């Protein structure tokens, strides 16, 4: 199922490359111009920042409490196209219930000898002197085929997959560069269309999968606003902003309420003030991306955790901490 879903994810990823609209052009011709502009790019470098400002408001009927949650992070991303590889290095600061945590991260994804994808990720928290590595290899992924597929998608393909774009009537200026401003929205309806298209191509109803159905339920109401700024002269996307600030949090709030079901008369509401990502990108030669020897040694020695297990534990920990935080607020 993972391999089949990759097709849909590739479509969503390719959406970030559909740029450079001009009123005298069609979407297809502009998309081709973008492909021509990026075809010779041997690599790309991105500087990215993210911000989360949220709160959980809790009430037991007589007392109201608010639990602030904040997160900020900066990341530097490098990518090469042949072979396909990425390097992500950055850090995050998290704060909740008056407690702060600083985390340093780095991740390396490289094309394996069999064409699959190998990912090595390192995390070090402020309470951890050494940090630890996690590893995953997926041989079901053919990175070369995925790259070829993303380059072959057209604007018409995007529409078929539920992705539509809006071009601002006026040019925007980004770091002194005149740019086209192109925006799109990815929501549960978009994801549902992608899932149905993947099901058609796979000859299998993926919506019947329990894990997929549960994920779609969690995503219901969430909305991702994306704006791309495209160099008007080169048709290269040089900046991007994303936010989820227009999301309907009804479903997430119902999950929080379920976690507090044991607390009679208690209600809780998640308030999202800002959840955004900003990135700027440059194109050109990027130094070869290599996995650090310490990461390879950790895997060989069996000291690296599974990335799948790490992800599952993070989700479980987040759910537990949210419930405990809300319960503690009520107790106060």
Task: Place the predicted regions along the sequence by residue.
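Sec-dependent N-terminal signal peptides of Gram-positive bacterial secreted proteins and lipoproteins
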Residues: 2-22
């Amino acid at each position: 199922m993972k391999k089949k879903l990759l097709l849909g994810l590739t479509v969503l990823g390719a959406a970030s490359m559909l740029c450079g609209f001009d009123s005298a052009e069609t979407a297809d011709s502009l998309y081709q111009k973008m492909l021509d502009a990026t075809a010779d790019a041997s690599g790309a470098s991105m500087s990215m920042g993210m911000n989360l400002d949220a709160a959980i408001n809790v009430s037991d009927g007589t007392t109201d409490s608010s639990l602030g949650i904040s997160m900020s992070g900066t990341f530097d991303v490098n990518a090469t196209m042949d072979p396909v590889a990425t390097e992500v290095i950055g850090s995050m600061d998290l704060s909740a219930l008056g407690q702060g945590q600083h985390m340093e991260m780095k991740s390396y994804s490289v094309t394996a000898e069999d064409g699959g994808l190998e990912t090595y990720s390192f995390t070090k928290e402020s309470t951890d002197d050494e940090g630890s590595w996690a590893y995953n290899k997926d041989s079901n992924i053919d990175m070369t085929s995925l790259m070829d597929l993303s380059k072959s998608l057209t604007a018409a393909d995007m529409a078929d997959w539920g992705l539509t774009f809006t071009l601002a009537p006026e040019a925007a200026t980004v770091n002194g560069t005149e740019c086209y401003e192109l925006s799109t929205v990815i929501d549960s309806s978009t994801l549902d269309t992608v899932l149905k298209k993947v099901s058609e191509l796979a000859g299998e109803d993926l919506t019947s999968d329990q894990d997929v159905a549960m994920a779609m339920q969690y995503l219901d109401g969430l909305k991702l606003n994306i704006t791309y700024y495209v160099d008007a002269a080169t048709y290269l996307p040089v900046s991007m902003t994303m936010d989820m600030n227009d999301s309907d949090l009804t479903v997430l709030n119902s999950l929080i309420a379920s976690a507090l079901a044991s607390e009679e008369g208690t209600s809780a509401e998640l308030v999202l003030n800002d959840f955004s990502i900003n990135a700027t990108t440059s194109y050109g030669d990027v130094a070869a991306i290599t996995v650090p020897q310490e990461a390879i040694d950790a895997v060989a020695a069996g000291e690296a955790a599974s990335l799948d297990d790490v992800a599952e534990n993070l989700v479980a920990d987040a759910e537990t901490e949210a419930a405990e935080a809300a319960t503690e607020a009520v107790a106060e």
